[in-house]
């Protein structure tokens, strides 16, 4: 049993999370440590890649007393590091929330028809400001010295893998938008930016051993390639089973459905099928980050915010919150959307605003979920949920009411960490397939059931939410243009 312990790492948006699991799913040790994000302007969001590597090595030293069979790794994606031939980052990592490449994205997207997108990706997925090809276009244009020195354009887990093993590789799923249904790079996409194809790392399977730790703590321990945190988290929460619905809540909200059927739907993402699993996904731009923002501007702790919402009922003083603080991904894919409180009255107090934040995030998740229900042609009667946003009983119940669906929550660790462990278990033969591994390793809490009366009220408010998002789109764009002009002056 000792030789069958596994470590899962999740290099997330705000922290490195890790855990040691035994074969039965018992968590023997955990590690979580935050790192900073820099915002040097209204569109720039950056991180230091060395923070990720430093914290992974720190966790490995802490876990070093265990006998580890293998390590699995997942990470945030659409965060890009431009790396030289010696394996060193040439500049800060451009985080997925960064919008500097919005103009390049719009220009590239205009060059591709919806028919081409469906042929490449199965759905008319847009090229947005977080797309790798848009980022490469921006760097090539604005930082030609960095572009000329770039050997690899890497994702966080792949950069960490390079530093730990000395080998450059990546996986197909993490490169959504660059690969086709056969899990190969799409030459026509890479050709949109001259030199892009030569800067992509070799593709290997998500369960393939990418290399072994070359020095330091746990030297010689194999590391499985792994994949993006969203896909790992969706599988870790139960997405390996066909027609299952998954909801991950972290910095942002990610909705997913496993389905072999594809109905091309604007706003949805369909990951290439791997190991027989085909996931439809709708990642939003804001989730737990909206709660963090409100905590910071209001001066109340996030724990106090949760207690405040628990003691507050929805009523006439509760406004509607649009959580698009830094644009929106699914289903709108609009970097210019901004947040708002609507319906604030003289009776509205801080607790009402806090409740509105919880509800607004859930409304955005509801709209995202409806998009992939259509894409996957699936309507589940239960949603398996995981991530930090589901630690709040009150917020979980609000979500159940707004989604009007039963919810069960994962209690066996962070979804991404568990997903990475599942990949390591399959890669080393400890478990034979995803469903077997998930059954052995995952544990759930009791279900949350929607309150029929609350669900009915929220259904009416959701219709207003959708109209408000549409009405706010032009206003947001006009405000951004004005603010950018004023900042330049």
Language-model segment annotations:
Residues 106, 229-236, 282-285, 291-295, ...:
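Glycine-rich phosphate-binding/hydrolytic loop that grips phosphoryl groups
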């Amino acid at each position: 049993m000792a030789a069958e312990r596994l470590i899962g790492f999740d290099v997330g948006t705000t922290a490195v999370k890790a855990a040691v699991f035994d074969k039965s799913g018992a968590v023997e040790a955990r590690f979580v440590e935050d790192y900073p994000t820099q915002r040097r302007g209204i569109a720039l969001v950056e991180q230091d890649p060395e923070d990720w590597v430093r914290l992974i090595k720190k966790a490995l030293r802490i876990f070093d007393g265990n006998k580890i069979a293998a390590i699995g790794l997942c990470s945030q994606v659409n965060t890009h590091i431009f790396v030289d031939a010696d394996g060193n980052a040439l500049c800060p990592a451009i985080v997925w929330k960064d919008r500097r490449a919005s103009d390049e994205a719009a220009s590239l997207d205009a060059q591709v028809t919806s028919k081409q997108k469906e042929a490449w990706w199965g759905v008319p997925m847009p090229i947005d400001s977080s797309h790798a090809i848009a980022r490469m276009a921006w760097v090539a244009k604005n930082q030609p010295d960095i572009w000329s020195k770039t050997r690899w354009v890497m994702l966080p887990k792949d950069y960490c893998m390079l530093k730990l093993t000395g080998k450059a590789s990546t996986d197909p799923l993490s490169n959504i938008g660059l690969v086709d249904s056969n899990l190969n790079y799409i030459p026509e996409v890479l050709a949109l930016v001259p030199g892009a194809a030569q800067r992509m790392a070799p593709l290997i399977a998500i369960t393939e051993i990418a290399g072994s730790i070359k020095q330091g703590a746990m030297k010689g321990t194999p590391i499985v390639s792994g994949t993006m945190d969203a896909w790992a988290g969706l599988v870790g929460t139960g997405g390996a089973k066909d027609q299952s619905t998954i909801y991950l809540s972290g910095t942002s909200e990610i909705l997913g459905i496993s389905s072999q059927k594809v109905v091309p739907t604007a706003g949805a993402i369909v990951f290439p099928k791997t190991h027989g699993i085909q996931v439809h996904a709708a990642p939003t731009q804001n989730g737990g980050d909206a709660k963090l923002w409100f905590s910071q501007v209001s001066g109340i702790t996030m724990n106090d915010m949760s207690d405040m919402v628990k003691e507050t009922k929805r009523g006439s003083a509760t406004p509607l919150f649009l959580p698009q603080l830094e644009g929106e991904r699914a289903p709108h894919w609009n970097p210019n959307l901004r947040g708002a409180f609507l319906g604030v009255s003289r009776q509205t107090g801080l607790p009402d605003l806090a409740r509105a934040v919880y509800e607004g995030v859930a409304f955005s998740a509801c709209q995202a979920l409806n998009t992939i229900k259509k894409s996957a042609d699936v309507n589940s009667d239960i949603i398996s949920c995981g991530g930090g946003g589901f630690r709040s009983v009150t917020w979980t119940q609000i979500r159940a009411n707004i989604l009007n669906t039963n919810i069960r929550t994962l209690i066996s660790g962070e979804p991404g960490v568990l997903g990475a462990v599942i990949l390591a278990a399959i890669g080393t033969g400890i478990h034979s397939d995803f469903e077997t591994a998930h059954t052995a390793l995952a544990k759930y809490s009791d279900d949350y059931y929607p309150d029929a009366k609350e669900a009915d009220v929220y259904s009416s408010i959701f219709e207003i939410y959708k109209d408000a998002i549409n009405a706010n789109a032009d206003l947001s764009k006009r405000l951004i243009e004005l603010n950018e002009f004023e900042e330049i002056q």
